[in-house]
From Swiss-Prot:
Family membership: Belongs to the ClpX chaperone family. HslU subfamily.
Gene3D superfamilies in alphabetical order: 1.10.8.60, DNA helicase RuvA subunit, C-terminal domain, P-loop containing nucleotide triphosphate hydrolases
Name of the protein in question: ATP-dependent protease ATPase subunit HslU
A GO term from the CC aspect: HslUV protease complex
Keywords assigned by UniProt, alphabetized: ATP-binding, Chaperone, Cytoplasm, Nucleotide-binding
Keyword Signal belongs to the record: no
Native organism taxonomy: Bacteria, Pseudomonadati, Pseudomonadota, Gammaproteobacteria, Pasteurellales
Native species: Haemophilus influenzae (strain PittEE)
Function: ATPase subunit of a proteasome-like degradation complex; this subunit has chaperone activity. The binding of ATP and its subsequent hydrolysis by HslU are essential for unfolding of protein substrates subsequently hydrolyzed by HslV. HslU recognizes the N-terminal part of its protein substrates and unfolds these before they are guided to HslV for hydrolysis.
Region (Disordered): 143-163
Length: 444
């Protein structure tokens, strides 16, 4: 798991997300508390439970982006789900328990990658020997027994040197590699029977897992395939499962987006298949329960839950009281101003202006944005948000696409040219659409 300090986490998030200091601080503290808890001795460690977070803010201000960036920083099992995808137990649709199953699958993948990285040096040595065996098949004596490699020692060392220097990369050889194919059977699970179908799926996948087949490939590609093959052999599947389950139970993070969409409105009456019933199903997960997965039983007591929602129609108080109590840390994200839009266009690590410059550079076209142009684009996006629906920073994508439309279409015929985008260019491309409310409603 990540050992970054809260200050380092906030600094990393600042490279991608403008503003929202409170949300960044809350997430950074929660992530650091995961590490702090793991430093405690066992009796006390078990008693320290995570403080779940509820992020509240209008659409397009950075809630989902914080989740995306957090997933990369966490170095722990992480999953982001949409609350609207789930239905109450007994109805057609996904049940909330599948969140933990998916989180465990994510942990298996993460732990497998870590184990492969740990065993990579040994796997590379073994793969190298297999390549050399294919290049220099060991001699057999008169009884058909394979002799040791010593008789080929000097030749073998010469080939090893060439292999390491890349001189043999394009030579084709025939090697035995794992077939790496499953039976291709996909089983759809009826509600409540996911565990049985998971076991059947595993059974079919295991049927072809031990097979090997001869493949002809270049040494460069064959070496990669054999390294993966050898690394997989060095991993103990049972140990892998246990490590993955431990990682989920101790360090797992679940991000639930659009939680406001499962609030029951006061005036609403009728079946709430995907509303209050889902909240009640979420309760046991958030407060701690045991979920059965195909890898084993997983306890959710110490999994960190971060929920977010725009809460434009509903309010946080419309969540059922029990769920409100399980999300003790409330963070409000503020709406973005024109100045924020200006910073979003230039400051982040891969800002929109940098993306368009890089895309056009592939066609040999050099794009330059003036400071006035950036300010004008930000004002245009802010103005359209004010006049129509406020979709936050997402409006910048629409405005930029409209602005770059002519250049993007003609770029292949403009090789070697430089295009300076200034305030006049922006006004010409966006002026009419921004000023006419009817046009901006349908075009931007």
């Amino acid at each position: 798991m990540s050992e970054m300090t809260p200050r380092e986490i906030v600094s990393e998030l600042d490279q991608h997300i403008i503003g929202q200091a409170d949300a960044k601080r809350a997430v950074a503290i929660a992530l650091r508390n995961r590490w702090r808890r793991m430093q405690l001795q066992e009796p006390l460690r078990h008693e320290v439970t995570p403080k779940n977070i509820l992020m509240i803010g209008p659409t397009g201000v950075g809630k989902t982006e914080i989740a995306r960036r957090l997933a990369k920083l966490a170095n722990a099992p992480f999953i982001k789900v949409e609350a609207t995808k789930f239905t109450e137990v007994g109805y057609v649709g996904k049940e909330v328990d599948s969140i933990i199953r998916d989180l465990t699958d994510s942990a298996m993948k993460l732990v497998r990658q870590q184990e492969i990285a740990k065993n990579r040096a040994r796997a590379e040595d073994a793969a190298e020997e297999r390549i050399l065996d294919a290049l220099l098949p060991p001699a057999k004596n008169q009884w058909g027994e394979v002799e040791s490699h010593d008789s080929h020692s000097s030749t073998r060392q010469a080939f090893r040197k060439k292999l390491r220097e890349g001189q043999l990369d394009d030579k084709e050889i025939e090697i035995d590699v794992s077939a790496g194919v499953s039976m291709g059977v996909e089983i759809m699970a009826p509600p409540g029977m996911e565990e049985m179908t998971n076991q059947l799926q595993s059974l079919f996948q295991n049927l072809g897992s031990d097979k090997t087949k001869k493949r002809k490939m270049k040494i460069k590609d064959g070496l990669k395939a054999l390294i993966d093959d050898e690394a997989a052999k060095l991993i103990n599947p049972e140990e892998l499962k246990q490590k993955a389950i431990d990682a989920v139970e101790q360090n797992g993070i679940v991000f639930i987006d659009e939680i406001d969409k499962i609030c029951k409105k006061g005036e609403y009456s009728g079946a709430d298949v995907s509303r209050e019933g889902v909240q009640r199903d979420l309760l046991p997960l958030v407060e701690g329960s045991t979920v059965s997965t195909k890898h084993g039983m997983v306890k959710t007591d110490h999994i960190l839950f971060i929920a977010s929602g725009a809460f434009q129609v509903a309010r946080p108080s419309d969540l059922i009281p029990e769920l409100q109590g399980r999300l003790p840390i409330r963070v409000e994200l503020t709406a973005l101003s024109a100045a924020d839009f200006e910073r979003i266009l230039t400051e982040p690590h891969a800002s929109l202006t940098e993306q368009y410059k890089a895309l056009m550079a592939t066609e040999g076209v050099n794009i330059a944005f003036t400071t006035d142009a950036v300010k004008k684009i930000a004002e245009a996006a802010f103005c359209v948000n004010e006049k129509t629906e406020n979709i936050g920073a997402r409006r910048l994508h629409t405005v930029m696409e409209r602005l770059m439309d002519k250049i993007s279409f003609s770029a292949s015929d403009m090789n070697g040219q430089t295009v300076n985008i200034d305030a006049a260019y922006v006004a010409d491309a966006l002026g009419e659409v921004v000023e006419n409310e009817d046009l901006s409603r349908f075009i931007l």
